[in-house]
Swiss-Prot record:
Residues 379-463 form the KH-like domain. Gene3D superfamilies: 3.30.300.20, P-loop containing nucleotide triphosphate hydrolases (3.40.50.300). Belongs to the TRAFAC class TrmE-Era-EngA-EngB-Septin-like GTPase superfamily. EngA (Der) GTPase family. CDD domains: EngA1, EngA2. One of its GO terms (molecular function) is GTP binding. GTP 2 binds at residues 209-216, 256-260, 321-324. GTPase that plays an essential role in the late steps of ribosome biogenesis. Associates with the 50S ribosomal subunit. Residues 3-167, 203-378 form the EngA-type G domain. This is GTPase Der. The gene is der. Keywords: GTP-binding, Nucleotide-binding, Repeat, Ribosome biogenesis. It comes from Rhizobium leguminosarum bv. trifolii (strain WSM2304).
């Protein structure tokens, strides 16, 4: 992108609505509750021929540095320093407040270009608020309606004037993003070939878990900076925020998500939106790290989150966080491994890594587990190998007989990866018990080294070419 723009202003003036308008998607949560946005969220904006990076920020308020609002303010100030231009959004409908005046003074001290934006200008009675904005001393306000998309041409012209025409329309090579990845991964490849794993491809990783498990602290430790808002308060993260960094030459795109509580406890509309946003992050990710609090692991919600991730078909890795608070580590680790095997039978062989997001202990091992799990998630097995394996499995443990006739498994092939899915042609597929399916899945895990990822097997009844034809007499 040619330049970076930060959207700033006090809470509830419509910053996230404007952000969603500029990126063309509902990426940021929007609600009437003030202070919905807490972390800074970047996005790729397009506006009437302009392309640039846009950063949504938390509402600026006067607050003590150590308070949650104070830490949110520090994140917003970091975005202002990072940006080339700030869009200072005020509420023309409800008018200015002393906070607006203080923020205008702060932006002037920064010495960077500012475009004053009078949002909600479509509302009745907004003229007074629009003209009051002149008193902020930041030039002529640009009237817009972020909700209805009005005034976008004027906003573009104001940005071009502030940043300069050459900078605004600078050409550069832009990498292709938002590529639609077909679920039929490997489609078009020879089914008897086993493609090599591409360890240079960017990897999407979602970090999920219960509130206050240390998800944001973990990502900050990976990045080596306080990029995400953290603190002792549970439920700080609301939006799913994505950040990028390199690990041993590979681009990693990580999604921090809101803590996921039991549905019965989620009553507020805003928290429901946050959890829905976390679910979208899980579906967009390739590998999901489920963060457990090692001091109170295997709560019911922990188990439900793991089950959700596997049902969504994602590769899963467990991270037992806060390991720096554990005293008898060997005994606790042995107990965690026993409980993992016993309480998560559907995730047999899942990789589980003790870590400390606070100190950074164990993070290299966690990253290697993420890469190894993604490798398995992308695995493809040749049809020839699968059918030799299927024959051996039936010899060792034949399928059951139905009405005196044994079910025959005739042919097997892998129909997709991400996660691995297989199709078996057989007789009487409707009569094959679930226990035999589990036997085959466990065999695939053991014989083809496929731990920790969902494996799906679909059965298709082999057609009888003589069915329905009259017998000769």
């Amino acid at each position: 992108m040619s330049f970076t723009v930060a959207i700033v202003g006090r809470p509830n003036v419509g910053k996230s609505t404007l952000f969603n308008r500029l990126v063309g998607k509902k990426l940021a949560l929007v609600d009437d509750t003030p202070g919905v946005t807490r972390d800074r969220r970047p996005g790729d904006a397009r506006l009437m021929g302009l392309t640039f990076t846009i950063i949504d920020t938390a509402g600026l308020e006067e607050a003590d540095e150590e308070s949650l609002q104070g830490r949110m303010r520090a994140q917003t100030e970091a975005a202002i320093d990072e940006a080339d231009l700030s869009l200072f959004v005020v509420d023309a409908k409800n008018g200015l407040t002393p906070v607006d005046t203080a923020l205008a003074e702060m932006l002037r001290r920064r010495g960077k270009p500012v475009v004053l934006v009078a949002n909600k200008s479509e509302a009745r009675g907004s003229d007074s608020g629009f003209y009051d904005a002149y008193t902020l001393g930041l030039g002529e306000p640009t009237p817009i309606s972020a909700e209805h998309g009005e005034g976008m041409l004027d906003l573009r012209d104001a940005i071009v004037e502030a940043i300069g025409k050459d900078r605004a329309y600078a050409k550069e090579d832009v990498a292709v993003t938002n590529v639609d990845i077909s679920e039929a991964a490997g489609e078009g490849e020879d089914e008897d070939e086993e493609p090599l794993y591409d360890d240079t491809k960017p990897l999407r990783v979602a970090i999920v878990g219960r509130p206050n498990a240390g998800k944001s602290t973990l990502i900050n430790r990976f990045l080596g900076e306080d990029r995400l808002l953290t603190g002792p308060e549970a439920g700080i993260t609301r939006d799913s925020i994505s950040v990028e960094w390199d690990w041993r030459g590979r681009t990693i795109k990580m999604f921090d998500t809101a803590g996921m509580r039991r549905k019965a406890r989620v009553t507020e509309k805003l928290e429901k939106l946050s959890v829905a946003d976390a679910l979208r992050a899980i579906r967009f990710a390739e590998t999901v790290v489920i963060v457990f609090d090692a001091t109170i692991p295997f709560e019911k919600q922990d188990l439900q989150i793991v089950d959700l991730v596997l049902r969504e078909g994602r590769a899963a890795v467990l991270a037992f966080n806060k390991w720096d608070m554990i005293e008898d580590r060997q005994a606790v680790l042995a107990d965690l491994r026993e409980k993992t095997d016993r309480l998560l039978p559907q995730a047999r062989g899942i990789r589980a890594v003790p870590i400390s997001g606070q100190t950074g202990w164990g993070l290299d091992k966690l990253m290697q587990s993420i890469i190894d799990t993604d490798r398995v998630w992308n695995k493809r097995i040749s049809t020839a190998k699968l059918n030799r394996w299927l024959e051996t499995q039936q010899i060792q443990h034949p399928p059951p007989a139905v009405s005196g006739r044994r079910i025959k498994l005739k042919y097997m092939t892998q129909v997709k990866a991400r996660p691995p899915a297989f199709m078996i042609s057989c007789t009487r597929s409707d009569a094959l018990p679930e226990s035999y399916t589990r036997y085959l899945i466990n065999g695939l895990r053991a014989d083809f080294d496929m731990p920790s990822v969902p494996i799906r097997i679909h059965f298709r009844s082999a057609e009888n070419p003589f069915e329905g034809k009259k017998r000769r007499t």
